[in-house]
Structures are given as structure tokens and as C-alpha cells.
Amino acid sequence: MKTLSPIYLASLYLVLACLFWAGNFIVGKAASIIDIPPISLNFYRWFLAWLVLLPFTCKELLIKKKIILDNIFLFSILGILAVSVFNSALFYSLRHTQVITGVLMISTVPVMIILFSFLLKIEKTNFFQISGVFFSLTGVLFIITKANLNNLLNLSFNKGDIFALIAMFAWSLYSTLLKKRNLIYLQFLYYRSL
């Protein structure tokens, strides 16, 4: 059997990550149409993830029990931000706003990660990151306003947009705090899904 090159595998995983992220928004919107409560959708989604990960992580979790106990506070905060706040706020927002609006707001997460990393002194900010922030925000504003300044001045937010912003802040803070520790990611993902 032919093995896949690391570059090919990395590219494949990046494409799959994008598909899963997009699927999260589509499933969230579909669930809102058939009236599945956001909290229920979030619970069942992560319960299923917990069950799927159990056979792959159980042994390692027992071996790494000390690492988990030493980081229990951080793991709990990360779990609350990523699982509870982000997903519940995102699914709730999709009940009241369009998928494209939610995706556009979430696309500013890298900008917020840079900002949180700077504010929490986790990572120094450089010229390229500042340039990226500028171009990212410009692009998002360009799309949201359809390149019309009047649209920006008359911009109004609905309940869904506010919850999309909450989701964006939660995921940004989660991603920033995740940089603080070198974690065994599969086991952390399992613990986080609890």
C-alpha cells in the first residue's frame, strides 16, 4: 500500500476541517428550521463526539491523569468557551440570522486571536499580523457593506448577529488560551467534550 506524503495529508486535513466547519453552520441552520433547541443540538453533538473519541482516548487519559488534573482549571475554562458558549451561541444565532452573516462574523476570529494574544501577552504582534488584521477586517467590511459606505453607516444588528459576536469572542479567547499550553490534543478534545 502506498503511503501518503505529509504535505498531501496536511492538505487533506485542512480541507476536511473547512468542510466540518461549514457543516457545523449548515447543520445549525437546518436544526433551527426544524426547531431543535440550540442547547439540545449542542449537547447531542458533543455527546456523540465523546462516544466516538472514547475508545481512542480512554487508555491515554488514564496514563496522563496527572497532566489532566494539573490543568483541570484551564481545561474546564477551555471546555466552557469552546463547547458550551461557542456552539450554543452559534446555534442560537443561526435561528435568527443568515448562515452567510454568521460565517462572515466568525471569519474575523483570526483577528480577535491576534488581539487577545497581544492583550494577554501570550504572543508578540508583528507587522505582518497587523497587516493581515487590516486586510481581513477590510475584506469583511467590504463584503458586509457590499462596498457601499452608506450600508456601513446604516448597519443594524439583530439578535442572531449579537449571538454570533458572542460565539466569535468565545472561540477567539479559547484559541488564544489554547496557545498557552502544549496539550495532547486528542485527549484534550475528549475531556473538552465532557
Q: What residues fall within each predicted segment?
A:
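Glycine-/small-residue-enriched transmembrane alpha-helix faces in small-molecule transporters
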Residues: M1-Y44, L153-K180
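Residue-level signature of transmembrane alpha-helical cores of multipass secondary-active transporters
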Residues: Y13-L14, F75-G79, F91, V103, ...
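Hydrophobic core positions of alpha-helical segments in small-molecule transporters
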Residues: L16, F43-Y44, L78, M105-I106, ...
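Residue-level recognition of pore/gate-forming positions within transmembrane alpha-helices
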Residues: C18, W46-W50, S107-V111, V133-S136, ...
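Specific transmembrane alpha-helical segments of multi-pass solute transporters/efflux pumps
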Residues: F20, N24-F25, L54-T101, M105-I106, ...
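Helix-loop interface residues and adjacent transmembrane-helix termini in multi-pass membrane transporters
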Residues: I34-D35, H96, I122-K124, N182-I184
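Specific alpha-helical transmembrane segments that line the substrate/conduction pathway
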Residues: S40-L51, N87-F127, A167
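Hydrophobic transmembrane alpha-helices of multi-pass small-molecule transport proteins
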Residues: L53, T125-A147
